[in-house]
Amino acid sequence: MGQVLPLVTRQGDRIAIVSGLRTPFARQATAFHGIPAVDLGKMVVGELLARSEIPAEVIEQLVFGQVVQMPEAPNIAREIVLGTGMNVHTDAYSVSRACATSFQAVANVAESLMAGTIRAGIAGGADSSSVLPIGVSKKLARVLVDVNKARTMSQRLKLFSRLRLRDLMPVPPAVAEYSTGLRMGDTAEQMAKTYGITREQQDALAHRSHQRAAQAWSDGKLKEEVMTAFIPPYKQPLVEDNNIRGNSSLADYAKLRPAFDRKHGTVTAANSTPLTDGAAAVILMTESRAKELGLVPLGYLRSYAFTAIDVWQDMLLGPAWSTPLALERAGLTMSDLTLIDMHEAFAAQTLANIQLLGSERFAREVLGRAHATGEVDDSKFNVLGGSIAYGHPFAATGARMITQTLHELRRRGGGFGLVTACAAGGLGAAMVLEAE
């Protein structure tokens, strides 16, 4: 066991997570079509403050993230402060760590709490895959800049004459890694091949995710942590996530064709997480501040770790790298955990990480550790389903996982929970949570 790094303030206070909330998650171009991420963020933070009954002036900092950023609102965090009636002097800034963005937001607020610069803050994230920053071609962009500098009409017309029809076509946001040109699904296909993960295994995990998420909603386990969203034209509110396939059968998954490697692939739309709209946030405080306000925390942040690996091959192995580090810093092992929640970007990615967490060879030869991190107990793993079922608004997923895991830990009488995710750029995140 390496160095334990307790997450406490100088006064010995633990970092308390007192409340968490999210919007329902909606598939791209469905219930939240036309609603930008900044409005989803305002929606969830406003409702979170109202439900918690914590005076807005108690919140001293808001750290929020957005992966698909809109040029007109580059600092989503500040817009949320200004749009929710919070104190105008509340510090607010935005972060982005791809699919681990709200993990980063939580870590940043925790660091401010430990430094003593604040006693309470909000962390979270929002994304919309339905309201996208559609750009222009590089040639058109350059001409538009030059036209702005031109002094005469003839100069402007000459510049425009350089353009061809193809230069006028809109440019959607990139879906591939900037440094490699690989799409996420291409990486998932790499991982399926590298680690011998079959189509049947991927479909089975996806089916499990949907079945468990549907059961969680049916049992009323998500009611406290998911708000009702009222959206224009206000005829029908959105109450639940709309991606979950509660009535599907395992045989249905086999009917879909591969989405990335059309000829030899195993990754399909059904065993991958869909493009999704939504927002999620949590309130963090020092333990003593929560007591002052008479609040009973959902739980505590015990440790966290962020890692990075090469992007060319199997780059979605973040959980296999960050989990041992987070456990080490928490002074725990896999066997100490009550729950494990891993982000399901793709079934192939999820199964590869599970495989490597239990691999002695990977631990020795790649991580330089004496022993494997530990086998993943299926009875503890993604017990309420995962991102394949719920969906994945990039910046909101971490906050969803944290809130969901803490509520489930409390239902089970407390214990330790691990939440972990891969992210674009070869990044990984893991956090250990504790509930009493």
Curated annotation (Swiss-Prot):
Subcellular location, record wording: Cytoplasm
Record's keyword annotation contains Lipid metabolism: yes
Keywords: Acyltransferase, Cytoplasm, Fatty acid metabolism, Lipid degradation, Lipid metabolism, Transferase
Catalytic activity: an acyl-CoA + acetyl-CoA = a 3-oxoacyl-CoA + CoA
One GO molecular-function entry: acetyl-CoA C-acyltransferase activity
Pfam families (alphabetical): Thiolase_C, Thiolase_N
CC terms in the record's Gene Ontology section: cytosol
First-listed, main subcellular location of the protein, grouped into a coarse class: cytoplasm
EC number from the UniProt entry: 2.3.1.16
Active site: 99, 392, 422
InterPro entries noted in UniProt: Ac-CoA_C-AcTrfase_FadI, Thiolase, Thiolase-like, Thiolase_acyl_enz_int_AS, Thiolase_AS, Thiolase_C, Thiolase_CS, Thiolase_N
Gene Ontology BP term (one): fatty acid beta-oxidation
Pathway: Lipid metabolism; fatty acid beta-oxidation
The keyword Cytoplasm appears for this protein: yes
Subunit structure and binding partners: Heterotetramer of two alpha chains (FadJ) and two beta chains (FadI).
Biological function: Catalyzes the final step of fatty acid oxidation in which acetyl-CoA is released and the CoA ester of a fatty acid two carbons shorter is formed.
Annotated family: Belongs to the thiolase-like superfamily. Thiolase family.
Protein name: 3-ketoacyl-CoA thiolase
Lineage: Bacteria, Pseudomonadati, Pseudomonadota, Gammaproteobacteria, Enterobacterales
Gene: fadI
